Every structure is written in structure tokens, then in C-alpha cells.
């Protein structure tokens, strides 16, 4: 790998049209997991695959679900409006109160269910994966959260601005925004920022790019290591000159279109499957979380400075078809040894992953913006895949 190079990653805010859709889809997943226990429905039996489209004053939700009858269209619509309100959309072209919401959800296909539901009373085999696919996990020691620096700081910039907007400190900024950070690497380590891009919606129509920069620059500087921003750093703030029309009114959104923002900012491979709107029987989501968990614990254990981990599954088959680890020349143990010990340390069947990471819970809406990885595990079970509780187990097993 080259020692000196530039690498760029982007992030988008919760008000970006695609992220609005991710949020809505994940709110519906959470609704099923919240309502299930109240109705006596086993959380292991809940299924949700929800896709959302959002455009000018219109939201369309389609997909397949299984769960309590208490999850009515009226309840779903209420959750959707609350999510849009929380994001902050009260503009003429997209308002939480007046947007037209179409809900087109129907039961999960019986052909899919027969493979996924194998672990029901009387069955003689394990619960299978909800689909075929490949999933990647990645970790590196560039940041405290063991994430690549470019995506870590791109998220942090927008998260700080969002917090200020929600607190009322930045009332002139709208919900829709994007960031991009170009990081300079020397000897394979991040040492500075070459270019910064922030495009941010503003609620006063005639605000100039310079006026927007006055608002956002303090948060950019707060997010980045102080020594990384110098007089040689190039800034691009609202480079088109105007960003007044934002959100789904300015650009239609869809669930699952920001998979690189959701993961590692392009610093690691991606299997192609999106996360939002999917319950954890879908290995696109749960196995990607498991892969991150294992890669992070390998790095946290000091067994590698960088780790890429791939899992592969087939629909209706419980065990992963393959486990692959690449430590990019930084490993302190042979990669085939690491592959063996991670498979011994964690049950990587869909059911095993759900149990180990406690995924049958309403924890998904919080993942829908600012990345699924590099986050702090919370007391409600969110981001359990970011724990490093397996590090000592792996270290002892080598």
C-alpha cells in the first residue's frame, strides 16, 4: 500500500432525501419490535422489509411484514409523520403535517418464510438466512472508534451541526446537508485535511455561501483535530452558491441508496446490500453488523492494525458458506488462525448473530443517519456490534 496519498469520504445528514427514507423504513422496523411484545408476539417471529420513496409532499412505503395486528396503517402513518417532524421538515414542498403518505405493506412471501422459519416448533433444522449475499466488516486503528478517519470526521462534522440545529442554536440552517473530507496520509497514517466540502440547506433564501460558512465553520473546526486544518486546507462551502430548496422536495429519496455512507466511506469493500428497513433475519444487515463486530474486536485485541472480514450466506442455509479475513500485512497472527478463532468465538448463524448481538429490539431508527459503525453502544441495546467484549477472548485464543 502506498505510504503517501489522499483519501476522501462523504457523509449526509438525517435530512438528506435518502436518509429521510432510511429513517422512515427503520422506524417501521422498530414499530414492529415495539408492538410485538405488547401483543404477545414472539420477537423471533417478527419480519419487516420496508422500502420508502419520498418526493414533493409524498411518501410511499412498500414491502413485506409479519407481526402484531396492532401495527395498523394509522399507527404507521403516525410514526412516519413523527419522524419527518423530528428531522425538521416544515417547508411548503415537504411538511410532516401535510405530506401524502401511501402505505403498501403486505405479508412476507411464504417461499421465503419456509427457509427462514425452519426453527419453529417441530422443525428439525436451524433457522436459515433470509437471503444469499456477501457482507463485509472492517476496522482500523486510525480513530478511537476504530474507523477510517475520512468517514469518521465527515460524520462528526454533520452530527455537530445537526445537534446545534436541533438545539435552536442554528435556526437558519435546514435539515438537508452533505459533507466530504479529503484526508492526507503519510506512511499510511492520517496526518491532515487537504479539502473540506460542506453543502448545507439554509432557510433564508438569500444567504450567501460566505454567510453559510460563518455558520458551519466552527463546527467543522471542532470536529477535526486542530493541527489537521491549516492555511493550506481548501474549503468548499455551498459551492453552487445556493441551497434553499432541500430534502425530498429538491431531490427524490429512496431507502438504501447511501450504503457507503452507512459503512466505511469507501475504505473497505461492500457486499451491496443495504441495511435500513430490514429486520435482523436479513443477513444483509445482521451479518454486516457481525462482520464489523468481529473485525473491530480483532483490532481492539491488538491482533491487527487493519482488518477486513467477509461472510457469505445462502438463503435458507444457516451456517455461513465462507469466512475470510485480510489484515493487510498488519496481522499479529496468521489470517487462517483468525478465521478459525472468530468462528469458534461467535455463532455466525442468523439466529446466533441475533442472539449474541441482541438484535430483536427496536434499535434501528437511531442507526439511519451518521453511520451504522463507529457509534457508541447505548443502554437500550443500540449499536451492540460496536462493543469490544470479545477482544480478550480472541487474544487468548491465538
Curated annotation (Swiss-Prot):
GO terms for biological process: one-carbon metabolic process; S-adenosylmethionine biosynthetic process. One of its GO terms (cellular component) is cytoplasm. SUPFAM superfamilies: S-adenosylmethionine synthetase. L-methionine binds at residues 64, 108, 251, 282. Binds 2 divalent ions per subunit. Binds 1 potassium ion per subunit. The keyword Nucleotide-binding applies. InterPro entries: ADOMET_SYNTHASE_CS, S-AdoMet_synt_C, S-AdoMet_synt_central, S-AdoMet_synt_N, S-AdoMet_synthetase, S-AdoMet_synthetase_sfam. Mg(2+) binds at residue 18. K(+) binds at residue 51. Its cofactor is Mg(2+); K(+). It is found in: Cytoplasm. Homotetramer; dimer of dimers. This is S-adenosylmethionine synthase. It comes from Nitrobacter hamburgensis (strain DSM 10229 / NCIMB 13809 / X14).
